[in-house]
Amino acid sequence: AIRRQRQMCIRDSFYVSFFPQLVAGPIVRARDFIPQIRKPLFVSQEMFGRGIFLIFSGLFKKAIISDYISVNFVERIFDNPTLYSGVENLMGVYGYALQIYCDFSGYSDMAIGIALLLGFHFNLNFNSPYKSASITEFWRRWHISLSSWLKDYLYISLGGNRKGKFRQYLNLIITMFLGGLWHGASWNFVLWGTFHGIALALHKMWMSITGRKKGEQSHGWRRVFGVIITFHFVCFCWIFFRNADFQNSMDMLKQIVTTFRPQLFPQLLEGYWKVFALMLLGFLLHFAPDSWEDAVCRGVIRLPFVGKALMLVVLIYVVIQMKSSEIQPFIYFQF
């Protein structure tokens, strides 16, 4: 019995201290991780290749796209929104939407990749969230491990959808309100969470009125319109998430609404062409078909070991050449 307790203690300690997911996710459940500890560790060629691909893509997202557009554009706009026109503020918001995605998902990709190299499987944590045609779909694709944790431990504990429609909508708002508060004791985080909660409740209400089934996908122009609306709502909420205080958020919104000045865009593009080139690349990669990513991943898996090593060396060289400052801390480290 003592030996069994010692083994359980070692197993549990290993689970809570497993470094790839320790600081910023993905949130790995004990029921998914502990059974893997009991099995003999084995790293297949596919696991090794997929791990290298994920580390490569995560480092590319974080060190090349996220850090560069943050240091050279996004931080300047958000630090002093009143110094810039509405079009500059809007581009800053678009930049932050890409920055935070590349930062969060880049860390998750690297964590999942490192775990694969060590013989462990983590679940997917980001699934092209800006492709979402509704706010409900967005939360099925964004930080999936956090979304499922909030659902299992807050939403369902509050009653979920078991106590009528009104209670379901209220539970969604309360869950997201608490999710916002978890990020920090700030009105901006509270508003960010509450806005998402209200949007989720309104979408559930709309689905109930129109008779649409859970998980039913829209198609064609209807889906394109849904993606555009959802993306801009999420960007609106990012304004509150990113800004240090409520006044800065209101200043930014005021600039976008009252002093847009679109005629400045050509000058903006000329002055920040490297930033906009990276933003365009980032969004193109994000909205590319999933089959393209799968094809590239399969190609990496088939590469010999020397090819995989050379790929990482080239990426590290590009990171060194492009960085304009020290590598920035991951955004999620502050939460």
Question: How should these model regions be labeled?
Answer:
Residues R3-Q7, R11-Q334:
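Membrane-embedded transmembrane alpha-helical bundles that form the catalytic cores
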